[in-house]
Structures are given as C-alpha cells and as structure tokens.
Amino acid sequence: MAEQKIISLFDDDACTRYTILIASTIGEMREKKESIIDNTDPEIVKYLSQLLDVFRENFDTWAMAVVNRTGCALDPSTPKDQVEVKKFRQFSETEKSECFIKCLLLLILSLGNYSPYSRNLLYSIAEKLGLSSIVVYKAELITSSMLLDTFQTMESNQEMYELSGTRKMRRRIAMGLAGLAGGALIGLTGGLAAPFVAAGLGTLFAGLGLGTMIGATYLGTLITSAPMITALFGGFGAKMSMQQMGDVSKGLTDFEFIPLSVQSHLPVTIGISGWLGDYNEVDAAWKSLTVGDKSYYWGDIYALKFEVEALVDLGKSLSRILFSAGLGWVKGEVISRTILAPLAAALWPLSLLKVGNILGNSWRIAFNLSIKAGEALANALCVRAQGMRPVTLIGFSLGARTILECLLHLADRGETNLVENVIVMGAPMPTDAKLWLKMRCVVAGRFVNVYSASDYVLQLVYRVNSAQSTAAGLGPVSLDSNTLENVDVGDLVEGHLQYRWLVAKILKERLGYDNISDAEIQSLAVQEEKYESKQRTYYSQKEQEEEIEQEVLFDASSDTELAIQKKEDEVNEVRENKK
C-alpha cells in the first residue's frame, strides 16, 4: 500500500538496523514477562495459566501489528528520496537516533492507539540508542499538541460547524461534550487536517531540516480519521470529564474523574486518595504532579473522586488517633506488640482493641466502598474512558486498595494492555504472592509497593479489622524485584496520614521520578506541619472541653451551686475560645 511506503528518509543500512532493533526489543519485552513466570511457584503458575495464555495472545497480537507496520515502513527496497537521505547521512548519531524515535512514535500512533506496550517499546529503544527520556517526553507532547491543534482548528471552522448542524450534535456542544462532537467533524472534513498536521511536524522535527510532508505520511490515515482520533484521546477528555458515570459505578453514590491538568497528552495519570481531610481535598494530594517544567511526563492528570463523605469521616477518625493527646499511648502500645512480641489481634489488650474499634467503623465503611470503586475504575478503563492511551495509577491508603482491586478485575477480564505503571503506598492489601502475580500480569511497566513497618495506624486498623496478619503497606511482598519493586519508607512514614504530603517526595527521592519539583516537596512539608499543628490544637481543646464537662456532671451531685456555676462558666469560656 502506498501509505505503508512512507519512509524515504533512512538509508538501507539504517532501515535494516532499526528493524532489527525493534524486533529484538519486542523479544526482550516478552522474555522479561516470561521470566516472571519461570521464577514462580508451579502451583501459582497453574492457578494463573488461563490469564497467562490471554497475556501471551494479547502481547503477540500487539507485537505482530507493530512489526508489520514498522517492517513495511523500513523495507530497504522502498524507493528513497535521495535529497532527504543525503540530509540524514549528515546527521550525528544522536540526531539520527532522535529522528528515528520520533518517526517510530508516529508509526505506532498510525495503528490508532498508544498502548502501554507501545510506550514501553518506545522508551526501551530510546534507552538503547543512548537518548534521554526527555526526548521521548517532548516528542509525545509535541505530537499530541499537533493533533489537538488540528482538531480545534477544524472545530472552529464555520463550514465544519454547519456540517454538524443536527440538533443532537449542537445540543452536545452546548452540554460541553465538544470532544465527541468535534470528533465527528474531523470525519466530515478530514482532508482539511493535513496542513495543520504538517505545521505540527515542523515543530516535532525542528532543527533537522526535514520535509514535513514526509513526516505527515508517517501518521497514515490517523490525520483524517474521526474514529481513530476520537478513540485515541477518548473524545479529547470528554469521556473522563463526564459526570454521568452511572453505567460503570453502580453501588457508589459518587464516582468522577476530576481533571487537574488536561491538555490531551498521550499518557494519562490517575491519582487516588485513601482518606480526605475535607470535602474539597479530592485533588489536593495530586496537584504536585502538575507543578514544574517537566510535569508533562504524567500526561493528562486526573484525581479520582469517590464516596467523599466516607473518606472524610475516615480522615477524621485517623486524625483523632494520631493527634489526640489522650490517645498518645496507642503508638507505643502498637509498636511494642508488633515488633517486640507479634501477636494476633485477638490477644491484644482490651483497651487497644477498643481504640481499633473506634476507628474500625469508619474504616470498614470506607474500605468496602474502596473495593467497589476498584471495580468501577476497571469498568471505566475497559470502556476506554481514557481513550486508547497508557494509564499510570498512583494511590495511597484505601486509594491503593482501589487500584489493586481494579487490577484484579482487569485480570479477570483479560485486559492486559491498559495499565502502564502502578504505584501503591500504604496498601491495606494481603501480601499473598498469588494475588500480586495476578495483578502483575495486567501491568505493562513498573509495579511498585511502597511500605512502612513503622505505620502503627495501619498496623492497628488492619489487625483489628482483617484476618490477615500482614498488609503490603507494612512490609515487602515476597516476589522477585523484576516482578514487583518493594520500597521501604519506614524512615518517613509512621502515621499513615503522612502519605498525603509525601507522595511527591517518595516519587522523586525513592522512585526516581526527577520531574517532581523540589520547591513543591518543600511546600508540602510546610503544609504537613501546619496541618498537624492545627489538628493537635483542635483535639487538645476538644479534650479540655470534654474533661470540664465531665467535672460539671460530677460536681452537680453536690449542693454547691456556686461551684456548678463556676464550672459552667469555664465550659462556656472554652467553647468561646474554640470559636
């Protein structure tokens, strides 16, 4: 096909070298997955045999599509544009590699999707070519901007608006679903897209002096196909911004993706909090990902909002355990019984169990809802709310549990090529290797378990409310490091609530994501100090008020009216100061 004979830039040697590089890298990706299986207990492999077969089938289908597409494009027998080939030969090796990576990105996108496997392939090849990951980040950014600009330009064209003249489509535009409507417009006027795409490619290959229309053909029919563009970006964010998520979130009173930084980038990141300090803090823990000149690495960033009332109630209960002076003894009691003398929760002192039960009610409610949210998240990903783009999931506390439940549901459905990276912190999840391997089968990239043995709050609530003795958020999961990264943050986290302010610090300093802003990490540390100070003051006043009220009740049994009045005045004074 003419559209497949698209690269007239590389000479024969380069075509052969790059073809081999693509094939060998894909082979290594498959071998890496297979090695996870080879190093696993045979009983577990037997348990996961059906899922592993699905993974192999999905991977091989993807690999064949990529090999066929790039193989045709890099066929040495394809006629070459000698002017462009001459330019290419004058490039340095770094420039040649950079040019190839950008062409490979366009070729992959021409398949109509940008899957986690595809993104892993791109970054792996870039690393082999000695390129910084920043080259790929910027190529993704420029390419997505190019497609978005094309989309918006056509959508604003009056002639195209008239073509969308049905009442239904105009009503959609009025409702704010311009992403869906605009997708239809592209289909009606696809031929007008090429000039705008060419301009974008000029930016992508800036400084290399290449003909932009050669690059334009790399995208194949993507530049003129409404279904492909709309599917790739999920209606340019329209699907993820819709509040009507009833079909995927049955059993939940609220379930919504809150956009933090959404500019139709190629990757998608979703942050999920496991408790909230207030009703308006759904996105607070994830704003740090949007700060800095490298924040585009995360792509389109969303915070998942679900069952806010339950998560706020849980946050209040956790704060009471951590910051109430009257419960200061809990920390030492839990640690001594966990580290010095590990015991089942049933053998713990009654006083400690009572504290656990105080927290337990709000925990159990939120815990059960987080499991439902995990299924709803899996539903949303399966219907491609994110489009055909790779997704990174990051969560702490019950947000981590939501993510892990989502992975289990994806595994049950055989969806092995939706999620790129997963990072869970303080996860209240059993350390059963069988479960974690099952989840690993649906994570294409990094899978990270961040834990703290010093997290005495999680120790308390998990032991009281679970039959399991150990949570993944308290210690490592016994799997090979190539399968799962276990990261110890015991020197940073001891109170569970701290994950809320330490997400950015952990991502940068412990997991190597250098796109996080140092200034933002420092700002979060200050915010944490202010929050803790405010909470301690609040519970100190609350305890003082409760203590005085108890004294009033005690003195009321005497006949000393003056003493009673004095105590009542003290209570009123405390209440007034609190206001």
Swiss-Prot record:
Compartments, record wording: Cytoplasm; Nucleus membrane
Ranges that cross the membrane: 173-193, 196-216, 218-238
GO biological process, one term: vesicle-mediated transport
Molecular function terms, GO-annotated: lipase activity
InterPro entries (alphabetical): AB_hydrolase_fold, DUF726
Topology in the lipid bilayer: Multi-pass membrane protein
Alphabetic keyword roster: Cytoplasm, Membrane, Nucleus, Transmembrane, Transmembrane helix
SUPFAM superfamilies, per the entry: alpha/beta-Hydrolases (SSF53474)
Any one Pfam family match given in the protein's UniProt record, by short name: DUF726
Subcellular location, principal: cytoplasm
Keyword Membrane assigned: yes
Cellular-component GO terms for this entry: cytosol; nuclear membrane; nucleus
Keyword Secreted: no
Family membership noted in the UniProt record: Belongs to the TMCO4 family.
Protein name listed in UniProt: Uncharacterized membrane protein C6F6.13c
